[in-house]
């Protein structure tokens, strides 16, 4: 069995998550792989989560915060350069989740931090959570990835997660928040580089003690890797694609209601694969044509404020006599989507 160590110099989350998939799907069946990486400001959601439930999409767009959807399950997390992320990839027959946690705990001990496992997924120092993990398994391989809070901006956890309730009745997984702490609270000198070095050392030591050897070099990955590895570029394009980040959202219903001076609008949008598949509007408005036009305009549109605004603008041009009412509905719906 061989050891492989990769470290990303790129902070684009789509690149790093694509690298995970690339390694996972091209894994040498005779190797244990460690991948270390960190992201610029990003909300990463689990494979089965709804970004409109978990995130403040509009604020993220305004602040140039990435949205990424990972292949594995679990809850929504906020990443910035104060997070260090680790991924262990192994052949399924030789996968040892306990060993992975042991390596991280041993690395933290090298830095004077006593951590332990909390439940199945988390690590903590005292009663403070400092790491969460998620897992993925196929017939012949497994991976375990997690985040270590080094010096993350805790304020921004609240800035981009947990939006204003929109009456979204989602079928996906709702994240559970926990008390968390940064590792710098326990060692003020720790940073991404010192932690990465400690994890690499602990990884080599663990497998040296089990006769795998400790000579694995560190492979540095950067943007040039996309050009050198066509398969990696393919995974990158998928991670960056709107249809993956939004379109893979579980089915949900958005129900909102308001009163305009021309009537009540009770709007129900059934959203599947991030597109509005069914529109139901109850209204006491006198103009029945307006209600029919609104339903027709929203049907099969992406659940995206820019696409919805474009459809309403198109409807305005086609029916200028209804412009005031159309504008009312457009501003209201988009405002509700923004939270």
Curated annotation (Swiss-Prot):
It holds the Pfam family Lip_prot_lig_C. Keywords: ATP-binding, Cytoplasm, Ligase, Nucleotide-binding. GO terms for molecular function: ATP binding; lipoate-protein ligase activity; lipoyltransferase activity. GO terms for biological process: protein modification process. Its EC number is 6.3.1.20. PROSITE patterns: BPL_LPL_CATALYTIC (PS51733). (R)-lipoate binds at residue 129. GO terms for cellular component: cytoplasm. Disulfide bonds: none annotated. It is found in: Cytoplasm. Pathway: Protein modification; protein lipoylation via exogenous pathway; protein N(6)-(lipoyl)lysine from lipoate: step 1/2; Protein modification; protein lipoylation via exogenous pathway; protein N(6)-(lipoyl)lysine from lipoate: step 2/2. It catalyses: L-lysyl-[lipoyl-carrier protein] + (R)-lipoate + ATP = N(6)-[(R)-lipoyl]-L-lysyl-[lipoyl-carrier protein] + AMP + diphosphate + H(+). ATP binds at residues 70, 75-78, 129. Residues 28-211 form the BPL/LPL catalytic domain. CDD domains: LplA (cd16443). Belongs to the LplA family. Catalyzes both the ATP-dependent activation of exogenously supplied lipoate to lipoyl-AMP and the transfer of the activated lipoyl onto the lipoyl domains of lipoate-dependent enzymes. Monomer. In the transfer reaction, the free carboxyl group of lipoic acid is attached via an amide linkage to the epsilon-amino group of a specific lysine residue of lipoyl domains of lipoate-dependent enzymes. This is Lipoate-protein ligase A. It comes from Psychrobacter cryohalolentis (strain ATCC BAA-1226 / DSM 17306 / VKM B-2378 / K5). The gene is lplA.
């Amino acid at each position: 069995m061989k050891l492989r160590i990769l470290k990303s110099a790129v902070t684009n989350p789509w690149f790093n998550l694509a690298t995970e998939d690339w390694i996972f799907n091209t894994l040498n069946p005779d190797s244990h792989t460690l991948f270390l990486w960190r992201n610029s400001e990003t909300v990463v959601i689990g494979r089965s989560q709804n970004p409109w439930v978990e995130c403040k999409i509009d604020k993220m767009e305004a602040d140039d915060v990435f949205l990424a959807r990972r292949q594995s399950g679990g809850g929504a997390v906020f990443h910035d350069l104060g997070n260090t992320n680790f991924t262990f990839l192994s052949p399924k027959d030789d996968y040892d989740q306990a060993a992975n946690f042991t390596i991280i705990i041993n690395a933290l001990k090298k830095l004077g931090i006593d951590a332990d496992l909390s439940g199945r997924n988390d690590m903590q120092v005292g009663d403070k959570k400092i790491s969460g993990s998620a897992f993925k398994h196929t017939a012949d391989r497994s991976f375990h990835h997690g985040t270590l809070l080094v010096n993350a901006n805790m304020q921004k956890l609240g800035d981009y997660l947990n939006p204003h309730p929109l009456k979204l009745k989602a079928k996906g997984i709702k994240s559970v928040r926990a008390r968390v702490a940064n590792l710098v609270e326990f060692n003020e000198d720790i940073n991404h580089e010192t932690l990465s070095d400690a994890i690499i050392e602990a990884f080599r030591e663990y497998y040296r003690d089990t006769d795998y050897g400790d000579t694995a070099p560190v492979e540095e990955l950067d943007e040039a890797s996309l050009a050198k590895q066509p398969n990696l570029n393919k995974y990158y394009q998928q991670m960056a694609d709107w249809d993956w980040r939004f379109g893979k959202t579980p089915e949900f219903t958005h129900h909102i209601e308001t009163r305009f001076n021309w009537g009540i609008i009770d709007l129900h949008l059934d959203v599947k694969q991030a597109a509005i598949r069914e529109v139901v509007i109850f209204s006491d408005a006198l103009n029945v044509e307006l209600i029919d036009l609104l339903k027709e305009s929203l049907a099969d549109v992406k659940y995206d404020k820019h696409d919805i605004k474009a459809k309403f603008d198109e409807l305005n041009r086609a029916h200028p006599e209804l412009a005031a009412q159309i504008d009312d509905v457009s501003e209201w719906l988009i405002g509700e989507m923004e939270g």
